[in-house]
Amino acid sequence: MLSCFWFFSKHISSALMSLPRVLHRFTAPQCLASRYPLGPLLASPRRLLASVASSQDSTRPSRVRQNFHPDSEAAINRQINLELYASYVYLSMAYYFSRDDVALYNFSKYFLRQSLEEREHAEKLMKLQNQRGGRICLQDIKKPDKDDWECGLRAMECALLLEKNVNQSLLDLHTLASEKGDPHLCDFLETHYLHEQVKSIKELGDHVHNLVTMGAPAAGLAEYLFDKHTLGSESKH
């Protein structure tokens, strides 16, 4: 038994002593050695994945691209970002109105529907970008300007301004598409976006007018009744 232990100990010690010489002779593959000059140790999985991703040629030409100007492609990416920002703002509003100290749950449901709708708008533009042979470049989404939306009237006024800004951006994109001779993009915007934006602006304008007429925000009961009867009836349809 002791002789077996002595035999294995001797060979293990010999292997450990020779390990530095083995590592010294190891040469990393050229693709790694040039990227990671810290020695023969292999790169971490995260760094290796990043290097592989960065080495991919994301600018290779599309086989389906036709009559799609680079300016239109860039403008669509900006519009995607704006639609996601609008969704982010509406999401903030939705969960503000479901707080225990606000408790206007139909306001919350209304703004949550708006948030989902804006996200769908962004996804539809992403699908268009791929259909036309463009490349999606997502950007940082700006956080909402506030976390406390004060009252229903203030939130509706902010939503109205937001929809007007989104609509103006869509109109600018439509003008650009027309200037670049892109009837498909013009038709896409007219069919899926511009008419819907006009309806949303009118709806929000009506809500703001009715809240003001009812005495909001000074009359606290006004927003409660608006939440219960106006927005409550809308959520049932």
Swiss-Prot record:
It catalyses: 4 Fe(2+) + O2 + 4 H(+) = 4 Fe(3+) + 2 H2O. The keyword Mitochondrion applies. Keywords: Iron, Iron storage, Metal-binding, Mitochondrion, Oxidoreductase, Transit peptide. One of its GO terms (biological process) is intracellular iron ion homeostasis. Fe cation 1 binds at residues 83, 118, 121. Residues 66-215 form the Ferritin-like diiron domain. Its main location: mitochondrion. It is found in: Mitochondrion. Residues 1-49 form a transit peptide. Catalyzes the oxidation of ferrous iron(II) to ferric iron(III) and stores iron in a soluble, non-toxic, readily available form. Important for iron homeostasis. Iron is taken up in the ferrous form and deposited as ferric hydroxides after oxidation. This is Ferritin, mitochondrial. It comes from Mus musculus.
